[in-house]
A protein has these predicted regions:
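Non-catalytic, low-structured ubiquitin/UBL-interacting segments
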Residues: 1-19
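Surface-exposed beta-strand-to-loop junctions
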Residues: 5-11, 24-30, 63-72
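Second-shell loop/turn segments in exported
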Residues: 16-17, 34-36, 75-76
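Structured beta-strand/turn binding interfaces of compact recognition modules in eukaryotic regulators
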Residues: 20-23, 29, 55, 63, ...
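Active-site nucleophilic cysteine motif
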Residues: 22-32, 80-90
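Intrinsically disordered, low-complexity regions enriched in proline, serine, glycine
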Residues: 29-30, 38-44, 61-62, 99-103, ...
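Interface signal in eukaryotic adaptor modules for cytoskeleton, membrane trafficking
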Residues: 38-82
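Deubiquitinase catalytic domains
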Residues: 84-136
């Protein structure tokens, strides 16, 4: 399945999947690879993301089931998985759409910056595997 997915994206879109470490920070690693060509910048991406969410509490808190301050504190910790809330924040803070490919040549999900006029920037493209891992 994984090899077929990689071949499909290469053949139909010209994309190559770059594998990132599966250590709980894979989403942030994949974004760091897309933004900085360095997955080791994942800690900086995480920090910027959580700072942005904290500054925009009123916007993000309704999408978080637990106490928002506790959520942000927990998500700041290395190894905590990122999710759709963090992807939306990253899209907004970098003013770039984020396309998520999951075993298809077309994105399964796309996150857009809040100000749609800013989504002219090149998308961040991530692949999602086995319901728990992101690659670049």
């Amino acid at each position: 399945l994984e090899a077929d997915f990689a071949r499909l994206l290469k053949r139909t879109r010209g994309f190559e999947i770059k594998v990132v470490r599966g250590d709980g920070a894979c989403m942030f690693r994949a974004v760091a690879d897309q933004l900085y060509a360095d997955q080791d910048m994942h800690g900086e991406v995480r920090r910027l993301c959580m700072d942005y969410m904290e500054r925009n509490r009123d916007h993000f808190a309704p999408f978080v089931a637990e106490n928002f301050s506790s959520y942000v504190a927990r998500k700041r910790q290395p190894g905590q998985h990122g999710n759709h809330v963090e992807l939306q924040a990253i899209s907004e803070m970098f003013a770039r759409p984020i396309e998520i490919y999951e075993y298809s040549e077309n994105p399964r999900n796309v996150f857009y910056p809040t100000i749609r006029s800013l989504d002219v920037n090149v998308p961040i493209r991530l692949s999602y595997h086995g319901s728990s891992h992101y690659n670049s």
